[in-house]
From Swiss-Prot:
Binding site for Fe cation: 101, 167, 202, 205
GO biological process: deoxyribonucleotide biosynthetic process
Organism of provenance: Mycobacterium tuberculosis (strain CDC 1551 / Oshkosh)
Lineage, top ranks: Bacteria, Bacillati, Actinomycetota, Actinomycetes, Mycobacteriales
InterPro entries listed in its UniProt record: Ferritin-like_SF (IPR009078), R2LOX (IPR033908), RNR-like (IPR012348), RNR_small_fam (IPR000358)
Residues noted as binding Mn(2+) in the record, renumbered to the chain: 68, 101, 104
Cofactor note: Binds 1 Fe cation per subunit.
Protein name (database record): R2-like ligand binding oxidase
Length: 314
């Protein structure tokens, strides 16, 4: 591909009010360095956990770090798709997105190192076939497909897989698990800070994915069917992953966690995304570019979680 023009030189410059550039500016303003997080007390708290509690927490962290690494490796075709569309603002944001995924991989590995976990951790994923299906097959396949087919429909399928299922259901449920483990027991302060920082980053990621689906649905209503179909394909797989994780621990899950609570939480986060995308049907595409409802949805989820956890800790 040869370059014929530069978007930043066009008349009027860049539209700083567009959602992608709002997200980009937000990421710059909230920059954080993993090296600033103190994991000293986490090691002491870790030693006080039971064997099953350490096993559960290690498995949870393993799922997170492998997922962060997977997206670090797989997101590049989405950048190329944005370039093919001439969407500089989205491409700028996705460079930040990729950097943040790499940083998340770094900080989870730093936490594992800090609590003394150095063995090979692949076995923690071997017992979770749904995880392997999502992260080792569905995610790379739909993102890599953008290299050959950057069409709106392919973008919607890729965004559903990552932004709505992996981040919008599974990662949010994982943060919920960490909060139930850490906040309610006042342990692992480094992990608490880590999750707070990563959660803030990934709210922007999810908002961008919702925005991308909304603009394609607004432009062509056929993409609503693409969105709906892909969500309905993957939601059962995401819920099966939660069930597989709990099945490993029998009738007494570590930390007194509840499978039904987690399934309800994850389902709620998945189902509420349908309405946000549906609301874009028939809308002028230009309106979607400066509609901040995707970011507001993620902030709503975060506020709900804060209130729930505050009530549980009271």
């Amino acid at each position: 591909m040869t370059r014929t023009r530069s978007g930043s030189l066009a008349a009027g410059g860049l539209n700083w009010a567009s959602l992608p550039l709002k997200l980009f500016a937000g990421g710059n303003a909230k920059f954080w360095d993993p090296a600033d997080i103190d994991f000293t007390r986490d090691r002491a708290d870790w030693e006080k956990l039971s064997d099953d509690e350490r096993d559960y927490a290690t498995r949870l962290c393993t799922q997170f770090i492998a997922g962060e690494e997977a997206v670090t490796e797989d997101i590049q075709p989405f950048m190329s798709a944005m370039r093919a569309e001439g969407r500089l603002a989205d491409e700028m944001y996705l460079t930040q997105f990729a950097f943040e995924e790499a940083k998340h991989t770094q900080v989870f590995r730093m936490w594992l190192d800090a609590v003394g976990i150095s063995e090979d951790l692949h076995r923690y994923l071997d017992d979770l076939p749904a995880y392997r299906q999502i992260f080792y097959a569905e995610l790379p396949e739909c993102l890599n497909a953008l290299s050959a087919d950057p069409s709106p429909a392919a973008q919607v399928r890729a965004s559903v897989t990552y932004n709505h299922i992996v981040e919008g259901m599974l990662a949010l449920t994982g943060y919920y698990a960490w909060h139930k483990i850490c906040v309610e027991r006042a342990i692992l302060p480094g992990m608490q800070e880590l999750v707070r920082r990563i959660g803030d980053d990934e709210r922007r990621h999810m908002a961008w994915g919702t925005f991308t689906c909304r603009r394609h649905v607004a432009a062509d209503d056929a993409n609503w069917t693409v969105f709906e179909t892909r969500m309905n394909e993957l939601i059962p797989l995401a819920l099966r992953l939660i069930e597989e994780g709990f099945a490993l621990y029998g009738d007494q899950p570590p930390f007194d966690l509840s499978k039904d609570d987690f399934l309800q939480y994850s389902t709620d986060k998945g189902m509420r995304r349908f309405g946000t995308i549906s609301n874009a049907r028939g809308r002028p595409v230009a309106e979607i570019d400066v509609d901040y409802s995707p970011a507001q949805l993620e902030d709503t989820f975060a506020d709900e979680d804060r209130r729930t956890l505050a009530a549980a800790s009271a």
